[in-house]
């Protein structure tokens, strides 16, 4: 159910950016207030990303007010902060459907709206895309402006600086808005700084600056003195030296919650030549006290009542696989101070909060820099340490070359704890862990494990810790564990060996990972054999051979892309052994998996017990 827009009288007049631009500037503060209230109530009704959007309300209003979107290109980095953008671009009546099956996409998405000029979900991509659009705009001579909005967290990624270095060299007209919500230099935010930012972005100052360069071109000593004078003036209020060195003109920082200051500064900057950076200071969770105090805890929320000023209480349930990993990491660190935990800015999501607090000297947050995180682990392994890189499946894609070149090629014993393997649900195609088994399986020297439950996960992590002949990976899903009895004692599993879980006839299900329970349920209806394969690489060739010799049909089950996945490994083995055998591969299809709840997505892809049974029966009927 959508909100009653009559409760928001000014926002009701701005369903599109064009309507927003018809309003007098004096009404923009009220637009921002109503937009924030709408967002608060909307996310409370539907669930979704929360704190980031509250922090970008004034910025979003100012951008769409000053720039002629969608003709002017606006690119959001990652997209957590883009809910206000969706509300102002004709989608407010559908906001209650966001992240839900057949509802609005969780991030800016080109197929959804012409205002979403670039589909996003991973951090650090916006400036590269914006640069390309700026170059295209110059080629077309259409007068189009280009703006990228990026957070301070994403600025830690190497791709960002690669793009800025290139943009500084090409010198096309573009604006990068640095949304800094860490408040690291908050003492510089205020009336004086806003005034100086507007002054430095104004036509008089920039004309004087460019004219001065021409006049002083042949007078290097005076030119250097003038440059230092300007740097001294700017240095009083801006930390922009790095951006200037990359070839950007830097303005700021200014208060990102002062919509009038944002509008005036952006108007001044809109027609500046060359690449520009506008540094704004914002606060995540702005306008909602609990989110301001705990922006990480309120990053994404379930449905809640905003008037209660707290998230709904949840009854303690089964531990998540992330928590199982976190406990194992603490347990092993108690025994071995050579164990090092590495995460690319996913401490909370990966279950490493307790580890970071109890073992701070063994904990390394590499920031949003997956390539660096992987090679950091490689370097530690070279020095005799036991690095454990905790990383989401979808983000390991970003460190693939490092996994091959820096880890596997050197046979370094780095353990990868791969979270969010398989279907993740509401975050959609940018975050589904669909490809890791496929892209790791082809790498020489890798050992890849897929636990069927939390106890097996714990033992596999220990197996990877004990394995010193090369890199290893334990791949587990998002969400709650299965309820298996936890065995505190840690025992290394024999490498490349599976176990038979059910003995049946004719059909053998070779299961990889936490789909085991569904495979067993389906097998009960078929009187089929079920094998918990455990290892994707190396495969248990002896067990696969036995199943092929004693059964008419093999069925592989995995929550990974069928193409190149564990099932493909079984087929390759059978072909190598010259054992022709019908094999049905059950897994993720050759398409990007859309958003929805994990249960909905699993059902639609026929990966639950009912779906597995249906796929097998359909195969038998052919």
From Swiss-Prot:
EC number: 2.2.1.7
GO molecular function: 1-deoxy-D-xylulose-5-phosphate synthase activity; magnesium ion binding; thiamine pyrophosphate binding
One Pfam family matching this protein: Transket_pyr
Record: residues binding thiamine diphosphate: 80, 121-123, 153-154, 181, 288, 370
Superkingdom field: Bacteria
GO cellular component: cytosol
The entry's keywords: Isoprene biosynthesis, Magnesium, Metal-binding, Thiamine biosynthesis, Thiamine pyrophosphate, Transferase
Binding site for Mg(2+): 152, 181
Cofactor note: Binds 1 Mg(2+) ion per subunit. Binds 1 thiamine pyrophosphate per subunit.
Cofactors (names): Mg(2+); thiamine diphosphate
Subunit description: Homodimer.
Entry protein name: 1-deoxy-D-xylulose-5-phosphate synthase
Organism: Shewanella sp. (strain W3-18-1)
Gene that specifies this protein: dxs
């Amino acid at each position: 159910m959508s909100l009653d827009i009559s409760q928001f009288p000014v926002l009701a007049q701005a369903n599109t950016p064009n309507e927003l631009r018809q309003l007098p500037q004096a009404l923009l503060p009220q637009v921002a207030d109503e937009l924030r209230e709408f967002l608060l109530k909307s996310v409370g009704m539907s669930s979704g990303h929360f704190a980031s959007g509250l922090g970008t309300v004034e910025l979003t209003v100012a951008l769409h007010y000053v720039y002629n979107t969608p003709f002017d290109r606006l690119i959001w980095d990652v997209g957590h902060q883009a809910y206000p953008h969706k509300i102002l671009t004709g989608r407010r009546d559908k906001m209650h459907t966001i992240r839900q099956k057949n509802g609005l996409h969780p991030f800016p998405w080109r197929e959804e709206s012409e205002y979403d000029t670039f589909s996003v979900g991973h951090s650090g991509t916006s400036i590269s895309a914006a640069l390309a659009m700026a170059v295209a705009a110059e080629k077309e001579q259409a007068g189009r402006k280009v703006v990228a909005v990026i957070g301070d967290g994403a600025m830690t990624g190497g791709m960002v600086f690669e793009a800025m270095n290139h943009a500084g060299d090409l010198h096309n007209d573009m604006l990068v808005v640095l949304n800094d919500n860490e408040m690291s230099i908050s003492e510089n935010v205020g009336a004086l700084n806003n005034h100086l930012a507007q002054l430095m972005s104004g036509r008089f100052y920039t004309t004087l600056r460019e004219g001065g360069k021409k006049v002083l071109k042949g007078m290097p000593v005076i030119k250097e003195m003038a440059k230092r004078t300007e740097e001294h003036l700017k240095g009083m209020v801006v930390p922009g030296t790095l951006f200037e060195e990359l070839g950007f003109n830097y303005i700021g920082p200014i208060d990102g919650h002062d919509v009038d200051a944002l509008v005036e500064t952006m108007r001044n900057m809109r027609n500046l030549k060359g690449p520009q950076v506008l540094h704004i200071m914002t606060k995540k969770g702005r306008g909602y006290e609990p989110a301001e105090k705990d922006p990480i805890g309120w990053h994404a929320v379930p449905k809640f009542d905003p008037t209660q000023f707290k998230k709904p209480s949840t009854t303690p349930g089964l531990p998540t696989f992330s928590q199982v990993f976190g406990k194992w990491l603490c347990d092993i660190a108690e025994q071995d101070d050579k164990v090092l935990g590495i995460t690319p800015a996913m401490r909370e999501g990966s279950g490493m909060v307790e580890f970071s607090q109890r073992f701070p000297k063994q904990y390394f947050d590499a920031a949003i820099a997956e390539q660096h995180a992987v090679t950091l682990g490689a370097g530690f392994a070279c020095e005799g340490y036991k690095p454990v890189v905790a990383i989401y499946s979808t983000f390991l894609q970003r460190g693939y070359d490092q996994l091959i070149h820096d880890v596997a090629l050197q046979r370094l014993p780095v353990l990868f704890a791969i979270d969010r393997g398989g279907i993740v649900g509401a975050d959609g195609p940018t975050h589904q862990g669909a490809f890791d088994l496929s892209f790791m399986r082809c790498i020489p020297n890798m050992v890849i494990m897929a636990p069927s439950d939390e106890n097996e996960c714990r033992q596999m992590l220990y197996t990877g810790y004990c394995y010193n002949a090369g890199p290893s990976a334990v791949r587990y899903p998002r969400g709650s564990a299965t309820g298996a009895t936890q065995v505190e004692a840690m025992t290394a599993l024999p490498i490349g060996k599976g176990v038979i879980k059910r003995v049946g006839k004719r059909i053998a299900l070779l299961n990889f990972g936490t789909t085991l329970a569904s495979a067993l349920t389906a097998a009960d209806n078929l009187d089929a054999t079920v094998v918990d394969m455990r290892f994707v690489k190396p495969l248990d060739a002896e067990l696969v051979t036995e199943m092929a010799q004693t059964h008419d049909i093999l069925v592989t089950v995995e929550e990974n892309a069928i193409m190149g996945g564990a099932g493909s490994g079984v087929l390759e083995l059978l072909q190598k052994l010259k054992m022709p055998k019908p094999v049905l591969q059950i897994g993720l299809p050759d398409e990007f998996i859309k958003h929805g709840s994990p249960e909905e997505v699993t059902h639609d892809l026929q990966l639950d017990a009912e779906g597995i049974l249906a796929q097998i029966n359909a195969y038998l009927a052919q």
